[in-house]
């Protein structure tokens, strides 16, 4: 009897995630606001904006879009996996969610982080002259911020590759059984 009560209480705690999911949807509102603000800035300066600044603005918009997609993916998958099934929604609209298990979600999150990091690096590359001009010429490589950003991006890439390989090995072993 005590065991069943404990199990019921533990299972009911999943609903504590629901307010967090709702709060996380506010992050989408903030990202949407930042996206529209950047888009408005780009459009309002269309006559005077340089090609480099236009590309940087576009990369910023892509970055915000990727981030919003990542938040939405984690939000929906978390709710679906841990709180309750999304049964009031047209199933054709969220078919990817039905086929997304925890390992697939980890892989998608890893790949999204790599993409966001790569966009950040590309934005830095577009302003490379400004960055390099602010660093003294005799600065060691370990003190160069671009060096560390590339290293961090490579860590993200290696982590995503390792997650993909691990997922593939685990999936092939489960398939064999």
Swiss-Prot record:
Question: Which sequence ranges are marked TM in the entry?
Answer: 15-35, 54-74, 102-122, 145-165
Q: Does the keyword Disulfide bond apply?
A: no
Per UniProt, the keywords (alphabetical) are: Cell membrane, Membrane, Transmembrane, Transmembrane helix
One CC-aspect GO term: plasma membrane
Topology versus the membrane, per the UniProt entry? Multi-pass membrane protein
Q: What is its main location?
A: membrane
**Location in or out of the cell:** Cell membrane
Family assignment from sequence similarity: Belongs to the UPF0114 family.
**Which HAMAP family does its entry note?**
UPF0114
Task: Name the chain's protein.
Answer: UPF0114 protein HPP12_0190
Write down the species: Helicobacter pylori (strain P12)
């Amino acid at each position: 009897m005590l065991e069943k009560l404990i199990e019921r209480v533990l299972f009911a705690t999943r609903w504590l995630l629901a307010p967090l999911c709702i709060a996380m949807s506010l992050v989408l509102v903030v990202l949407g606001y930042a996206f529209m603000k950047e888009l408005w800035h780009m459009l309002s300066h269309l006559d005077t904006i340089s090609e480099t600044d236009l590309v940087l603005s576009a990369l910023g918009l892509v970055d915000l879009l990727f981030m919003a997609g990542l938040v939405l993916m984690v939000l929906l998958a978390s709710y679906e996996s841990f709180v309750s099934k999304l049964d009031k929604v047209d199933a054709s609209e969220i078919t990817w969610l039905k086929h997304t298990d925890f390992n697939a979600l980890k892989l998608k999150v890893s790949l999204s982080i790599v993409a966001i990091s790569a966009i950040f690096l590309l934005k830095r590359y577009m302003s490379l002259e400004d960055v390099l001009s602010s660093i003294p010429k005799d600065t060691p490589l370990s003190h160069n911020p671009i060096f560390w950003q590339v290293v961090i991006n490579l860590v993200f890439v290696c982590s995503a590759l390792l997650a993909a390989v691990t997922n593939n090995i685990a999936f092939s072993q489960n398939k064999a059984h």
